[in-house]
Swiss-Prot record:
Catalyzes the deamination of various vicinal amino-alcohols to oxo compounds. Allows this organism to utilize ethanolamine as the sole source of nitrogen and carbon in the presence of external vitamin B12. Pfam families: EutC. Its cofactor is adenosylcob(III)alamin. The basic unit is a heterodimer which dimerizes to form tetramers. The heterotetramers trimerize; 6 large subunits form a core ring with 6 small subunits projecting outwards. Residues 17-37 are annotated as: Disordered. It is found in: Bacterial microcompartment. This is Ethanolamine ammonia-lyase small subunit. It catalyses: ethanolamine = acetaldehyde + NH4(+). Adenosylcob(III)alamin binds at V210, E231, C261. The gene is eutC. Pathway: Amine and polyamine degradation; ethanolamine degradation. InterPro entries: EutC, EutC_C. Keywords: Bacterial microcompartment, Cobalamin, Cobalt, Lyase.
Amino acid sequence: MDQKQIEEIVRSVMASMGQDVPQPVAPSKQEGAKPQCASPTVTESCALDLGSAEAKAWIGVENPHRADVLTELRRSTAARVCTGRAGPRPRTQALLRFLADHSRSKDTVLKEVPEEWVKAQGLLEVRSEISDKNLYLTRPDMGRRLSPEAIDALKSQCVMNPDVQVVVSDGLSTDAITANYEEILPPLLAGLKQAGLNVGTPFFVRYGRVKIEDQIGEILGAKVVILLVGERPGLGQSESLSCYAVYSPRVATTVEADRTCISNIHQGGTPPVEAAAVIVDLAKRMLEQKASGINMTR
């Protein structure tokens, strides 16, 4: 699927929902301007918040032949470029930012989604067989199965036999859920309903792994299960969300190749609203073809 097709899907879905298509915001001159500490000649004595935009835009190459080329390269990517060297070693500010980003990534893995946040969204909360974060990280197999209490809750409180069941799970990034929820779930649910699909009761699974959607689909009798789950964070990017969609999942027979994945959903990647439109189109095609993953015809 190329960019033109994605844009057409977004326009179609948003139009059917009666909403305007979001336009990309062009960076202003002020935003594009090189911050004080981004100058190649500025020393590392200036105190910056290592997580700020200024720190990310900092250029550490001293006495560059073409400073304008470095500035343009620095603006074009979030990768660690133009950081400079002190002999064979990274410069102090570059190293400190690396350590800060690493710390931020570890924090988002270890953080919990607050129960108050789940209640504020009006979501039913269930758990996998995991009881705490440490067990979640060391026993991924238990994160693939619902607890007995969760199974009872789904059977008693959720719509049975829906066309599409949407599930939200913390996964390996709490920030991915809390940062993107408002911009992806409401338009996703609205788009699915606008398409005439019977949508199940959305709910939140704490300590869930991807394969848990197979058991959910089997219990609820869902034709398509859509799991929105936090991705393992990378350095400097802790808010990336993934969508795993599968048709008619079964615990015993569904394999990873049966899933269709849309990853890198966040403001710096695939915008959540755009991802919602693509997921709606994907669910419709899965129901039409009665397939998902590598079994779908393109």
